[in-house]
Amino acid sequence: AKKNEIDVALIDTAGRLQNKKNLMEEYKKIINVLKKIDESFPNEVILVLDATTGQNAFNQVEEFSKIHNLTGLIITKLDSTAKGGVVLAICKKYNLPIVAIGMGEKEDDLQPFNAEYFSKALLGIET
């Protein structure tokens, strides 16, 4: 990306559980490679959380934060769970913004986060 003067490089990795230490080490390697290219990289680290994991999401954020500072969250599967409320507690504890939410499996089901819409959906208020 740098050689071709591209401003943005998106690195999407396979999902993994935070208790799989060998797989978590791969994230450290990615960060180290990026830092060799430019010490300021990565500029954004967004963790994608499955809303159905409930309280386990705290452990995920905690462990991923040990590898690199997170800058935001994407919350998926909000269309299939009532456990989305844990997201609010995570955002407060770790001071992280929600960047986007996933409300299905189609490409356009990933939407930029809208606090009003999210609040109403969480409370079961028709939007």
Q: What label would you give each PLM region?
A:
Residues 1-127:
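P-loop/Walker A NTP-binding module and the surrounding RecA-like catalytic core of P-loop NTPases
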